[in-house]
Amino acid sequence: MTEITAAMVKELRESTGAGMMDCKNALSETNGDFDKAVQLLREKGLGKAAKKADRLAAEGLVSVKVSDDFTSATVSEINSETDFVAKNDQFIALTKDTTAHIQSNSLQSVEELHSSTINGVKFEEYLKSQIATIGENLVVRRFATLKAGANGVVNGYIHTNGRVGVVIAAACDSAEVASKSRDLLRQICMHIAAMRPSYLSYEDLDMTFVENEYKALVAELEKENEERRRLKDPNKPEHKIPQFASRKQLSDAILKEAEEKIKEELKAQGKPEKIWDNIIPGKMNSFIADNSQLDSKLTLMGQFYVMDDKKTVEQVIAEKEKEFGGKIKIVEFICFEVGEGLEKKTEDFAAEVAAQL
């Protein structure tokens, strides 16, 4: 019988990441054969992983990988059962390695990922070994990659706690403008992480959805106005009820009508026509802002920029286009939040203990 030394246990533990007693028992069962002990731990670990597979994994981390040339950006979400494990160094390394693997192999689906090879083994087996070592069910829930086209650029941002990740892609009219836009895209990703827009622009909104939201907006404002009339607080005047909710509704005819109305008002005020061109753009912008509240709530381009709330994201991009000397068009963005849409399982401690008996 081979003597099992502390050094042997330490070596096996460092190699497999398994617990100290598990390593000692594995070495004892295999008469000190290191390779057989590794295999035995894998076999036992895989058994544990299978048991854990039915546990709900709703915690975890989002990871972002941007290629060095800013032509590819990948975001992934890997779930664990507890927030504690999500802070584990080994789990953090797993998320980063998996995201890099997805990007470098241009993987398109979770099924494709599981059948791919990482570090010489099938990813599915690799993940099971990580489950056995870490001790919780781990699930690669989703991932996506954005690629830059000709004269395009991508970037990404991961919030410091790893719970929110964003990737974004833009098309530019030159490689020079694309290169200059890298930092801007990262800042817009930070905005997205904070403000969570649901759409890129008003053009992506469905008209029926807009019309229904307009009715809800009017009802909400009228209810608030009723309360303000009751309180009679001079510091809280009644809301102005908008005619529309989105630029999606502002046809050329409606904009033309609004402009003509502004001209009539200026004429009635006795403003000389020679200064109208200086006044009309600002009043038209106010008209559009008043009648696009849905856009500022739900769309990236219509939201006020978190780093300068006097301007919309669209206006910030327009300023950068002038500064960089070319066009910048946001093509797509993707935002992942850990556990988004998953129902977290809650149990009291007594129930948890009882479930294990």
Curated annotation (Swiss-Prot):
Name by which UniProt lists this protein: Elongation factor Ts
Region feature Involved in Mg(2+) ion dislocation from EF-Tu, mapped onto this chain: 82-85
Residue ranges of coiled coil: none
Record flagged with keyword Protein biosynthesis: yes
Domain of life the protein comes from: Bacteria
Keywords: Cytoplasm, Elongation factor, Protein biosynthesis
Family of the protein in this entry: Belongs to the EF-Ts family.
Membrane-spanning ranges: none
PROSITE patterns listed in its UniProt record: EF_TS_1 (PS01126), EF_TS_2 (PS01127)
CDD domains with a match to the protein in the record: UBA_EF-Ts (cd14275)
SUPFAM superfamilies per record: Elongation factor Ts (EF-Ts), dimerisation domain (SSF54713), UBA-like (SSF46934)
InterPro entries, per the entry: EF-Ts_dimer_sf, Transl_elong_EFTs/EF1B, Transl_elong_EFTs/EF1B_dimer, Transl_elong_Ts_CS, UBA-like_sf
Gene Ontology CC: cytoplasm
Source organism: Campylobacter jejuni subsp. jejuni serotype O:2 (strain ATCC 700819 / NCTC 11168)
Biological classification of the source: Bacteria, Pseudomonadati, Campylobacterota, Epsilonproteobacteria, Campylobacterales
Compartments where found: Cytoplasm
Disulfide bonds: none
Keyword check for Cytoplasm: yes
Molecular function GO labels: translation elongation factor activity
Protein's job: Associates with the EF-Tu.GDP complex and induces the exchange of GDP to GTP. It remains bound to the aminoacyl-tRNA.EF-Tu.GTP complex up to the GTP hydrolysis stage on the ribosome.
